[in-house]
UniProtKB/Swiss-Prot annotation:
The gene is rplM. It holds the Pfam family Ribosomal_L13. This is Large ribosomal subunit protein uL13. The lineage of its organism: Bacteria, Pseudomonadati, Campylobacterota, Epsilonproteobacteria, Campylobacterales. NCBIfam families: rplM_bact (TIGR01066). This protein is one of the early assembly proteins of the 50S ribosomal subunit, although it is not seen to bind rRNA by itself. It is important during the early stages of 50S assembly. Keywords: Ribonucleoprotein, Ribosomal protein. PANTHER family: LARGE RIBOSOMAL SUBUNIT PROTEIN UL13M, RIBOSOMAL PROTEIN L13. InterPro entries: Ribosomal_uL13, Ribosomal_uL13_bac-type, Ribosomal_uL13_CS, Ribosomal_uL13_sf. It comes from Helicobacter hepaticus (strain ATCC 51449 / 3B1). One of its GO terms (biological process) is negative regulation of translation.
Length: 142
């Protein structure tokens, strides 16, 4: 009788995946990114092991949003001091810090523990089409 094989950290073979965000719907792109980071697209997926791939997002500012989200959706921050609540619209976040916008959206779809934080570190977001990971991407595609 053979037992089910459970993947260990040594069995994981990570790839570098480049996704172009140009003209893609933001929410659907984020779910795809979360699936790749978690490793659920692999047959060797194990919930307690970080078996996801590295994901590089290019053209992060050219993503599409449905509805009136660019004007209506707000992100709030609070430092802990009285009266320090600050808000930014989605349009402001996309112009100033698209990297933070992607990290916040993906973080909500990953586990809320050490494993989720390790998965989030494998996400690389860039505004334009240039990225410094071309050596890793070329090596993993072979």
């Amino acid at each position: 009788m053979e037992l089910t094989k459970i993947a260990t950290q040594n069995d994981i073979n990570r790839q570098w995946i480049v996704l172009d965000a140009k003209d893609k719907v933001f929410g659907r792109l984020i779910t795809e990114i979360a699936t790749l980071l978690r490793g659920k697209h692999k047959p060797c997926f194990t919930p307690h092991i970080d078996c996801g791939d590295f994901v590089v997002i290019i053209n992060a500012t050219e993503v599409k949003f449905t509805g009136m989200k660019l004007k209506d959706k707000e992100y709030f921050t609070h430092s802990g001091y009285f009266g320090s609540t600050k808000s930014k619209t989605l349009q402001e976040m996309l112009e100033k810090t698209p990297e933070k916008l992607y990290h916040l959206a993906v973080r909500g779809m990953l586990p809320k523990n050490k494993l989720g934080r390790a998965m989030l570190k494998k996400l690389k977001v860039y505004r334009g089409s240039e990225h410094p990971h071309s050596a890793q991407v070329a090596k993993s595609s072979k």
